[in-house]
Amino acid sequence: MKKWVVKIGTSILRGNEDQSTEQVIESLCKSLTSFIFKGNKVILVTSGAVGLGCKKLNLNTRPKELSALQAVAAVGQVNLMTLYEKTMKKLGHNIAQILITKTDFDSRESFNNASKTFQKLIDLNVIPIVNENDSIANEELKYGDNDTLSALVALAINANKLILLTDIENLYSKDPRNNEDAHPIKEVNSNQLKIIKDKNIQNYNNEWGTGGITTKLIAAEIATKGGVEVQLADGRNENNLINIFNEKKIGTIFHPVDKPVGNKKSWLSHAIKTVGQITLDEGACLAIEQKGASLLVVGVKEVEGDFTVNQAVRIVNTNKKEVAKGITSMSSDSLKRILNKKENINSSMIVVHRDVLALT
């Protein structure tokens, strides 16, 4: 049995002159059904609420004001789920709507609860349809794109693959719209992905969506570090999803790392909410990055913010570049007293244990 996550973007769902939104959803649902009938499980992460809301309200441009975006999303989400429910019912499937904000994943307990809900739904042969809760999320609580959200969902259910359906055929070396010498990149390993993402070689932003290729590279990094293969493909071609379900090498495939960090550390790296920051000296950075060591108090140079035991912090080097995140065994007050020489230093005291420390 395969357990896959499929993410479809706004640019596909809005349709075009040749294919309406209703036809796009019908084709998508038929493809998902064919995969499920073979004994597989699937979760759909869908964008489109704002785009469909604009269409319903006859708005020619995407609103910029947050309250207007939230209102339009509320209108569009109803339309979006009605289309999915109507289509899937004809095909003999039940669906469930799951709307998520960052707070639903920022603690281990809530992440586990979400994982259990997803698993129970697919065990009941229900297709979970996930979207960010754009109608209530403010800027602080938003992922801002469903690419990142889809990667976290893939981690939550220990998926085998994440499929990102978008409006480009492949990852390219350059933006093909502006560079005739751009060439497609068919396969990407973990080392190549880091280089490509860090260089940020391209960014196909569009009017209706909030993503672009950069967010897809970030999603690919999150998923592949957790052991999930990612395949990016052109969702405008209705045959592509069926071909991917049949293991065809279409678009760009991002291969998972050789040694996945696992569900828990992936969550630590990408979903947890941090409340403080710890700066390390060079020796401590090398110890946690190269030796997988716990963070000891002797390696701490500076403490910022207020946090208690069992809260999450960013861990940075002396240049303030983030190297890890972790859950502390000591409060900020205790650490500051030690740094200010008001308490004796026991160099073996653990600040963040390696079991709850994840490199970023």
From Swiss-Prot:
Enzyme class: transferase
PANTHER family, per the entry: GLUTAMATE 5-KINASE
Main location: cytoplasm
Domain PUA: 275-348
GO biological process: L-proline biosynthetic process
PROSITE patterns per the UniProt record, alphabetical: GLUTAMATE_5_KINASE, PUA
UniProt function note: Catalyzes the transfer of a phosphate group to glutamate to form L-glutamate 5-phosphate.
Catalysed reactions, as listed in the record: L-glutamate + ATP = L-glutamyl 5-phosphate + ADP
Localization: Cytoplasm
Keywords for this protein: Amino-acid biosynthesis, ATP-binding, Cytoplasm, Kinase, Nucleotide-binding, Proline biosynthesis, Transferase
SUPFAM superfamilies, per the entry: Carbamate kinase-like (SSF53633), PUA domain-like (SSF88697)
InterPro entries associated with the record: AceGlu_kinase-like_sf, Asp/Glu/Uridylate_kinase, G5K_ProB, Glu/AcGlu_kinase, Glu_5kinase, Glu_5kinase/COase_Synthase, Glutamate_5-kinase_CS, PUA
Family statement: Belongs to the glutamate 5-kinase family.
Residues reported to bind substrate: S47, D134, N146
Natural source organism: Prochlorococcus marinus subsp. pastoris (strain CCMP1986 / NIES-2087 / MED4)
EC code: 2.7.2.11
Annotated metabolic or biological route of this protein: Amino-acid biosynthesis; L-proline biosynthesis; L-glutamate 5-semialdehyde from L-glutamate: step 1/2
Name of this protein: Glutamate 5-kinase
GO cellular component, one term: cytosol
Annotated ATP binding sites: K7, T166, D167, T210, G211, G212, I213, T214, T215, K216
Pfam families: AA_kinase (PF00696), PUA (PF01472)
GO molecular function: ATP binding; glutamate 5-kinase activity; RNA binding
